[in-house]
């Protein structure tokens, strides 16, 4: 299936080179992607009436469909209807929360090219309306996750735009962010960090 961005440029995930590292299968991980772990965490929060957080769907405009059989349809070409904002949003303790989840295989830094301008602008708007915006960053080689407030992401983005480094060092993430604990249920207990950072 061909998927295109709103500007017509073709989306080709397979063309992005990547090495598949040997994953540590720990009690908290067992080979799941960050998105799968967060989806499971959010399901736990919802089921236990802790928070209501959902993954935002990616809106697609289907352009070409083949019907190899009467009962089957195969989408051959589609476009992203609009640039996506962030991955997740919801409500916790009466506050709107909005966040992006990112993974990196880098050992010492997180590249800012993993963000897009419209995502940064979206996080600015959430903050301007007294919402809570943050990013969950996973260093896959260390199996470490950090919650970093959007104000820091915005500051690092601005630093990049004024000739500064094009990445956030792991040390900066450790200094400004909060290490997330992983377990069985919930998998990634980011609500505990929200309580400490935003509600204490």
Swiss-Prot record:
InterPro entries, A to Z: Resolv_RecU, Restrct_endonuc-II-like, tRNA_endonuc-like_dom_sf
EC number: 3.1.21.10
Described purpose of this protein according to its UniProt entry: Endonuclease that resolves Holliday junction intermediates in genetic recombination. Cleaves mobile four-strand junctions by introducing symmetrical nicks in paired strands. Promotes annealing of linear ssDNA with homologous dsDNA. Required for DNA repair, homologous recombination and chromosome segregation.
Co-factor binding details: Binds 1 Mg(2+) ion per subunit.
Gene3D superfamilies in alphabetical order: 3.40.1350.10
Keywords, sorted A to Z: Cytoplasm, DNA damage, DNA recombination, DNA repair, Endonuclease, Hydrolase, Magnesium, Metal-binding, Nuclease
Coiled coil, from the record: none
Protein name as catalogued: Holliday junction resolvase RecU
Pfam families: RecU
Site residues (Transition state stabilizer), renumbered to this chain: 102
Cellular-component GO terms for this entry: cytoplasm
Family per similarity comment: Belongs to the RecU family.
Cofactor(s) named in the record: Mg(2+)
Catalytic activities: Endonucleolytic cleavage at a junction such as a reciprocal single-stranded crossover between two homologous DNA duplexes (Holliday junction)
SUPFAM superfamilies in UniProt: Restriction endonuclease-like
Main location: cytoplasm
Start and end residues of each stretch annotated as Disordered: 1-25
Gene this chain is encoded by: recU
Any GO BP: chromosome segregation
Positions bound to Mg(2+): 85, 87, 100, 119
Species of provenance: Bacillus cereus (strain AH187)
């Amino acid at each position: 299936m061909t998927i295109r961005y709103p500007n017509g440029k073709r989306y080709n995930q397979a063309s992005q080179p990547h090495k598949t590292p040997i994953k540590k299968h720990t009690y908290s991980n067992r080979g799941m992607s960050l998105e799968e772990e967060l989806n499971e965490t959010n399901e736990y929060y919802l089921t236990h009436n802790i928070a209501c957080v959902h993954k935002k769907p990616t809106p697609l405009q289907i352009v070409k469909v083949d019907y190899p059989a009467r009962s089957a349809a195969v989408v051959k070409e589609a476009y992203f209807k609009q640039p996506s904002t962030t991955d997740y949003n919801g409500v916790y303790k009466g506050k709107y929360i909005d966040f992006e989840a990112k993974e990196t295989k880098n050992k010492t830094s997180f590249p800012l090219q993993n963000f897009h301008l419209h995502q940064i602008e979206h996080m600015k708007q959430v903050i301007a309306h007294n919402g809570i915006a943050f990013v969950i960053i996973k260093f896959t080689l260390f199996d470490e996750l950090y919650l970093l407030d959007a104000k820091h992401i915005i500051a690092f983005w601005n630093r990049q735009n004024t000739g500064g480094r094009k990445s956030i060092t792991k040390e900066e993430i450790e200094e400004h962010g909060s290490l997330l604990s992983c377990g069985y249920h919930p998998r990634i207990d980011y609500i505990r960090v929200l309580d400490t950072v935003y509600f204490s």
